[in-house]
Amino acid sequence: MAAVGANATLLTNTKSTVEPVRPLANFPPSVWGDMFLSFSLDNSKMEEYAKAMEKPKQEVRRLILDPTMDSNKKLSLIYVVHRLGLTYMFLKEIEGQLDRLFEEFNLEDYVDVDLHTISINFQAFRHLGYKLPCDVFNKFKNNDSNAFKESIASDVRGLLGLYESAQLRVKGEKILDDASAFAETKLKSLVNTLEGSLAQQVKQALKRPFHQGMPMVEARLYFTNYQEEFSKYDSLLKLAKLHFNYLQLQQKEELRIVSKWWKDMRFQETTPYIRDRVPEIYLWILGLYFEPKYSLARIIATKITLFLVVLDDTYDAYGTLEELRLLTHAINRWDMRAMSDIPEYIRPFYKILLDEYAELEKQLAKEGRLKSVIASKEAFQDIARGYIEEAEWTNSGYVASFPEYMKNGLITSAYNVISKSALVGMGEVVSADALAWYESHPKILQASELISRLQDDVMTYQFERERGQSATGVDSYIKTYGVSEKEAIEELKKMIENAWKDINEGCLKPREVSMDLLAPILNLARMIDVVYRYDDGFTFPGKTLKEYITLLFVDSLPM
């Protein structure tokens, strides 16, 4: 969660004692205030939704298992179910169907199939981890020039499907690299000529492809923009509405819980310089996993990430270098006796931090899951060390080499704290073996981590310069490789693009671990894209994040 675009302000005191000079950031206030504190959960309404879902759920299950449905219709149905965020309800049935269809796959069967249908089939397989060959798109290229045929440029639905399919590519799939560029160019040239739902579909894909979006928001937008795709299935339409409204009630209650906790902790009084972003942080964590079973996990991860906001803003927008050195030492000691060594203003935070983790350790130890809490705590200590390194660089005017910057920057991106804290409340999914795999720092984790750092840097480097903060990856890349600012940004974007390919590869079968463990890694990269693609959406949440929070927690779907 990088820092801010506000101009630095100096604080001095006219009294005989001169106060330290502090880089106050004047963060924008919360967009929401106490709005979500007043929510009152109607348990009877949740029970009503849950009961009402049973019949359409059984009907959708029968559709998925229908042996008379041809393969293209079956794959289209599975794709729609996935886009609506309902896959987890029917995962066993869907994988059973895809296992059979994947085994029966024959490239010759696609000779007479149109681009839109092929694209839907391709996405249905790839999203669920089946590596359908990208050769299915070869027939849309010219044999002589190897370029995509201009004749498909008028097939808007086909182009849209091709563009969405290309986002699922892995390294070495040049045809999908070409497909992405070709389809994007053609769609941009056509978008202003389109009308109705198709225009909205294209605009949304160009703004952010489905694969790189927040699952719950993408499901909500799909429901609105693609109703003609699934309205023929009454049961699916009804289930999607009930499901969204059920989840909304559960999630608004979770948001109320963390909002009350935040208010009770009085952080806005004891550390008034910080960003007040409770709904935005909850949204971020919801982006990692929205399924009902992860309710406790979301609450835990949101609280820890809110701790991180206080820490980040203290290092970045308030503390003096000497104060930050003392705070870093105290966090590494992790001992209440260290409280007397740190500035008075940060002592309430320090006590609450240690108390909350102690309670988590007590709770998770009973379940035999203490290691996940320890991993989260150690990540928190790591980021404090990373923050002080950045503060020392800023103080001395030092610009690190790009490799040196990335070594520390991957830590200060906050990825490690958020991702490990997301594991704490996930239950049996996070076994000892799963945690060991996570700690081995596999390629998919490295890729998601890199996106978290560089997407942030590409969007915020100018703001950081204005505030006189430590050099970002853009600055370090320019210094290390002697390139222009434009060239540096282009190179970092290429690194981000390649990292997405590694994430896509890591989600394909056979997988090293279950998709339950991989999904938060994939989804954290998605949330970084949501927050930082167009602006610093966390510091200035009045655009994208406000729209998302309204979609998910304010507006319901009419039944």
Swiss-Prot record:
Its cofactor is Mg(2+). Pfam families: Terpene_synth, Terpene_synth_C. Coiled coil: none annotated. A motif (DDXXD motif) lies at residues 312-316. The Asp-Asp-Xaa-Xaa-Asp/Glu (DDXXD/E) motif is important for the catalytic activity, presumably through binding to Mg(2+). InterPro entries: Isoprenoid_synthase_dom_sf, Terpene_cyclase-like_1_C, Terpene_cyclase_plant_C1, Terpene_synth_N, Terpene_synth_N_sf, Terpene_synthase-like, Terpene_synthase_metal-bd, Terpenoid_cyclase/PrenylTrfase. It catalyses: (2E,6E)-farnesyl diphosphate = (+)-(R)-germacrene A + diphosphate. One of its GO terms (molecular function) is germacrene-A synthase activity. Monomer. Belongs to the terpene synthase family. Tpsa subfamily. It is an enzyme of class 4 (lyase). One of its GO terms (cellular component) is cytoplasm. Mg(2+) 3 binds at D456, T460, E464. Mg(2+) 1 binds at D312, D316. It is found in: Cytoplasm. Its EC number is 4.2.3.23. Keywords: Cytoplasm, Lyase, Magnesium, Metal-binding. Sesquiterpene synthase involved in the biosynthesis of volatile compounds. Mediates the conversion of (2E,6E)-farnesyl diphosphate (FPP) into (+)-(R)-germacrene A. It comes from Xanthium strumarium. Highly expressed in glandular trichomes. Expressed in roots and leaves. CDD domains: Terpene_cyclase_plant_C1 (cd00684). This is Sesquiterpene synthase TPS3. Pathway: Secondary metabolite biosynthesis; terpenoid biosynthesis. (2E,6E)-farnesyl diphosphate binds at R275, D312, D316, R453, D456.
